[in-house]
Swiss-Prot record:
This is Ribosomal RNA small subunit methyltransferase C. It catalyses: guanosine(1207) in 16S rRNA + S-adenosyl-L-methionine = N(2)-methylguanosine(1207) in 16S rRNA + S-adenosyl-L-homocysteine + H(+). InterPro entries: DNA_methylase_N6_adenine_CS, Mtase_sm_N, rRNA_ssu_MeTfrase_C, RsmC/RlmG, SAM-dependent_MTases_sf, Small_mtfrase_dom. It comes from Salmonella choleraesuis (strain SC-B67). Its EC number is 2.1.1.172. The keyword Transferase applies. CDD domains: AdoMet_MTases. It is found in: Cytoplasm. Gene3D superfamilies: Vaccinia Virus protein VP39. Monomer. One of its GO terms (molecular function) is nucleic acid binding. The gene is rsmC. The keyword Oxidoreductase does not apply.
Length: 342
């Protein structure tokens, strides 16, 4: 996070209107505006660990990372500024959660890029905080309303699940491939052989499908799963529990909270952060893997075929091989040897 996003720039056009406001920022917080905005008080809630990392340096305890907001997160706030994400169910989950805690009469602002579908906020909040569009600039929309009725929110009602090969996969809004196994992960799964042993790290674990499938035919594998997303962390824990599997699951910005070395690292790394294309996570994954692989350990990732990962793999490990591919995806494998750049 550094330069302001277009959505934040639209908000700054109205900064004078917020000088007396006690604001809760939430949603897709892609910059540090919540820490810098001139207002009476500022808090933030995020489901993204890497956003919390940045904001907590400036906001301290006034920003919290968790799956759901609690009453303490909205304490004394009279205004919500919500950054619309690209995922509509994720927006609905977060807004219903937060608005169930905000006092009636609170100002509600929703801002986001037009291509993200932000205009659907009007219909989503019609029964709770009817919205009017108050600005349109930088290909973004800014909407305002007042909270007339608090929605009811129960976390349990948001859980969903699907089944693959006898495994139950638990999911939540905002988790990658919430409605079923994606094609890339399916291709990566096809390359995993039974009776894998040793310590396995699943980076960007999503709903835990890769680890659950691996553990189902490799019971001696010791699993560690991590993701930047709070919904993904909770979904992975639930997936392991639903299938009687064990593993350590925690939030981490790629390797930021990972300790130790592993015999295998598997991943279907993201190449978007919110609406923006970003290869940062995948590059950090590949370059950082050398510090978390045992000698002879392997990195195995799946990616869209057009992404420039072969170059980064070769620069870091000295070589790579493609062990499976379709027209759209490739599974890359490389091994920790002496020639890897530590």
């Amino acid at each position: 996070m550094s330069a302001f996003t277009p959505a934040s720039e639209v908000l700054l056009r109205h900064s004078d209107d917020f000088e007396q406001s006690r604001i809760l920022f939430a949603g897709d917080l892609q910059d540090d505006l919540p820490a810098l905005f001139e207002c009476a008080a500022s808090r933030a809630h995020t489901q993204q660990f890497h956003h919390w990392q940045v904001l907590s340096r400036q906001m301290g305890d006034n920003v919290r990372f968790s799956l759901v907001a609690q009453a303490s997160d909205v304490a004394d706030c009279d205004t919500l500024i919500y950054y619309w994400p690209k995922n509509k169910p994720e927006a609905q989950f977060q807004l219903m959660n937060i608005l169930s805690l905000m006092p009636s009469g609170s100002d509600v602002f929703v801002v986001g890029e037009n291509r993200s579908g932000v205009r659907s906020a009007e219909q989503m909040l019609a029964d709770y905080a009817p919205l009017n569009k108050v600005d349109s600039a930088r290909r973004c929309g800014l909407y305002h309303g007042r909270l007339e009725k608090q929605p009811q929110f129960s976390l349990e009602s948001w859980w969903a699940e699907y089944n693959i090969d006898g495994l139950t996969i638990k999911t939540l809004p905002g988790v990658f491939s919430r409605d079923g196994l994606d094609v890339g992960s399916q291709l990566l799964l096809s390359t995993l052989t039974p009776h894998t042993k040793g310590k396995v790290l699943d980076v960007g674990c999503g709903a835990g499908v890769l680890s659950a499938a691996l553990a189902s035919h490799s019971p001696k594998a010791r699993l560690t799963l991590c993701d930047v997303s709070a919904p993904a962390v909770e979904a992975s824990r639930a997936t392991l529990a639903a299938n009687g599997l064990e593993g350590e699951v925690f939030a981490s910005n790629v390797f930021s909270e990972v300790k130790g070395r592993f015999d295998m690292i598997i991943s279907n790394p993201p190449f978007h952060d919110g609406m923006q294309t970003s290869l940062d996570a995948a590059q950090t994954l590949i370059r950082g893997a050398v510090r978390h692989l045992n000698s002879g350990g392997e990195l195995r990732i799946v990616a869209n075929a057009f992404l420039p990962y072969p170059k980064i793999l070769d620069e870091t490990f000295g070589f790579h091989e493609v062990i499976a591919q379709t027209g759209r995806f490739k599974v890359y494998r490389t091994v920790m040897t002496r020639q890897a750049k530590k």
